[in-house]
């Protein structure tokens, strides 16, 4: 079995696993919510095989995450159901725990880890995840590792912070060749040797009952759940199958026009993959691989003399160059920024020149000033902006070119830049399926 590269591993508790006194390996799945192209899951399988132990995949869904709503819950549960089906075909055991009251998950990881040799979880650099995984160190007494499966280049590889996309692109072009040939396994669970043997203490499953996806109605469950239902379920369906269907549709119909029309709201030339990326339901590696296969591209076509340029380095078509710049440069710059800058979502995180310019124009006369409520319900004089906000509120997405207009106009219509940023973050985090956390720090990937 191919080993997970050490550049993707962070050990939070460096304890030698004791296979004699423990029963299983745990993969605590919190960000990379998929069974394919997942380095974290692959690492868990690696440890389980090394120790001749079964694997438990623990995937919780807490109730009171920031801006929690039926929209996000439904999208995630659609994905969890498919994970449940995939794991059922393997030798692993899937333990989905969905809270019906806040804080119900508290204590479950601690109890399960008492008989675990190793606990593996996702190294996701933003939202509440870093704080949650760090806090868990106090509850876990065995070996505890974070594994990065965010993008093509490991997020902790660089020791330097990059602010400009051009500089980050040069850094990527210098390092990418090593990582585009080093990919996670397509189906890591197929490598698992040991069958699950009912080794979980039954008292644990009685206290924290796993959700039964096979015999439950997700919609009926959500109807009864005490959660914000004012943010409606999106017509965009979650899950790996829907992600793959959308990817295939994009390659067949939109990709050929991507470079020319991705910013045209009247065309459907963008990939629309962002929701699936954000919720970890599909991997950048898989999308990269599918585009490479479609193009018939190989690393021999790379032109090192064009390192740092937006076009030409890949030696591929115009569409491929453009798509990979969004998929890799801009998306991974977002992760990089969140790793290097803890205040990435605060006004103070902006570059000095930006803060200076915004400050100089903070007192400029504004023809229109709107409240957060007026913006929320599209009550402005601008029909195009209203349409973009309607799409965000009703569907959870905004066409990528209109999203830039959306943000610029909020800045123009707010009392000052600080208020504008707070409005953008509130609207974005409450409604958006695809722009949460990392991509806000840089730009949207696709």
Positions of PLM-derived features:
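N-terminal regions that are enriched for targeting/export leaders
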Residues: 1-25, 30
